UniProtKB/Swiss-Prot annotation:
EC top class named in words: lyase
PANTHER family: 3-ISOPROPYLMALATE DEHYDRATASE SMALL SUBUNIT (PTHR43345:SF5), 3-ISOPROPYLMALATE DEHYDRATASE SMALL SUBUNIT 2-RELATED-RELATED (PTHR43345)
GO biological process: L-leucine biosynthetic process
Lineage: Bacteria, Bacillati, Bacillota, Bacilli, Lactobacillales
Highest taxon, organism lineage: Bacteria
Keywords recorded for this protein, A-Z: Amino-acid biosynthesis, Branched-chain amino acid biosynthesis, Leucine biosynthesis, Lyase
Full protein name: 3-isopropylmalate dehydratase small subunit
Length: 191
């Protein structure tokens, strides 16, 4: 998993509440088990027509937001069915963090497990962040748990264990590999 320490990027506002996992990545695209390739179908029903033509009114299709790597959204992001593919699609598209009012618990944990930082902020902060210019960089400083713009700073909470995993780029396999010598020694001793 890629390390997440201090990240700078531009944002796209998608200020809907209750964006569910089927809206993030519809079920017809869940046939693969590889994490790559889901980004092209992210928000499929909103981004494309049935003929796969781009909807010019959807935020991600607007030229000024095409390179955004931070998503600003409303409450209850990632609700609905449990599908890790939703986090995969967001990450594969290029998002590194989501800043929203709240998340479903399963989506929140799936995001963290895949190196995608879900940040909770109050409505006032979300409104301020959503109004930023599409060209203004936002800095996310994970070690200091801080979102910085050119004019404001917003503090955020994160579990210290998840914070450490993200800063060190450790997924579950990476954590296990830290104990590889001890595991090998145990296996040799108990053959």
């Amino acid at each position: 998993m890629e390390k997440f320490t201090i990240y700078k990027g531009t944002s796209v506002p998608l200020m809907n509440d209750n964006i569910d996992t089927d809206q993030i990545i519809p079920k017809q695209f869940l046939k693969a088990i590889d994490k790559k390739g889901f980004g092209k179908n992210l928000f499929y029903e909103w981004r494309y027509s049935k003929d796969y033509e781009e909807n010019p009114d959807f935020m991600l299709n607007k030229p000024q937001y095409r390179k955004a790597s931070l998503l600003i959204s409303g409450d209850n992001f990632g609700s609905g069915s449990s599908r890790e593919h939703a986090a995969w699609a967001l990450a594969d598209y290029g998002f590194r963090a989501i800043i929203a009012g709240s998340y479903s618990d399963i989506f929140y944990n799936n995001s963290l497990k895949n190196g995608l930082l879900p940040i909770v902020q109050p409505k006032e902060a979300l409104k301020s962040l959503a109004q930023l210019s599409s060209q203004e960089e936002i800095t996310i400083d994970l070690p200091h748990q801080l979102i910085q713009t050119s004019t404001e700073n917003f503090y955020f909470e994160i579990d210290p264990i998840w914070k450490d995993k993200l800063i060190n780029g450790l997924d579950d396999i990476g954590i296990t590999l830290q104990y590889e010598q001890a595991i090998t020694a145990y296996e040799q001793k108990h053959q």
